[in-house]
A protein has these predicted regions:
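Short loop/turn motifs that connect adjacent beta-strands in outer-membrane beta-barrel proteins
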Residues: 22-31, 45-46, 61-71, 96-102, ...
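Transmembrane beta-strand segments that form the barrel wall of outer-membrane beta-barrel proteins
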Residues: 33-42, 68-80, 103-110, 144-149
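Solvent-exposed loop/turn segments connecting transmembrane beta-strands
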Residues: 41-51, 77-88, 115-122, 152-160
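Outer-membrane beta-barrel "beta-signal"
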Residues: 49-55, 133, 158-171
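Mid-chain, well-packed structural core segment of small domains
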Residues: 100-127
């Protein structure tokens, strides 16, 4: 029941952010991008590192041009081998230099430690940078690094650093 409530909250926040961003839309034929990734959760903590796998969705029809560049809403989730889970929604930008893409993102989300690392709070913030290479017109391969933190909302804030290998496909 707890997970169902968390899912409803994330979907609701995605719908709210989507309606806000829908005012300034950029229409394209390829409007859905999926990112499937796998890597090492909390690689800098020898005691709590764990394998992770995740999925992220981006709808490029909801892009918005801002002073930071072109921003797009993203929603996703990741699980670790220790049964920890993180469900998130936020924004990302994309800056291209030829076939190379630099993609920073920020996503608040809900974290459940499972048998994994206790990050100190249910609400965690993920800041990430991804570097990807265009393999084909609609396919990218990349490497990303992120940091999860509760911004000192909890009594403790150990944070977690992770790296992932990304496969991105646009439909």
């Amino acid at each position: 029941m707890k997970y169902l409530r968390i899912c409803y909250l994330v979907i609701l926040s995605f719908l709210i952010s989507s309606s806000i961003l829908a005012e300034d839309t950029k229409v394209s034929n390829d409007n859905t991008k999926f990112n499937i990734y796998s890597g090492m959760f909390d690689f800098s903590d020898n005691g709590k590192r764990s394998t992770l796998i995740g999925f992220q969705h981006q709808n490029t029809d909801l892009n918005r041009d801002t002073f930071l560049g072109n921003l797009s809403p993203i929603t996703g989730f990741m699980f670790t081998a220790d049964s920890a889970a993180y469900l998130y929604t936020g924004v990302q930008a994309q800056y291209s230099i030829g076939a190379l893409n630099i993609i920073p993102s920020f996503t608040p989300g809900l974290y459940n430690k499972g048998d994994g690392k206790d990050l100190g709070h249910l609400l965690e913030f993920k800041s990430e940078v991804q570097i990807s290479l265009n393999l084909f017109q609609n396919t990218q391969l990349g490497l990303s690094y992120n940091h999860l933190s509760n911004a000192s909302l909890g009594d403790k804030n150990p944070g977690a650093n992770s790296y992932m290998f990304n496969f991105l496909k646009t439909f």
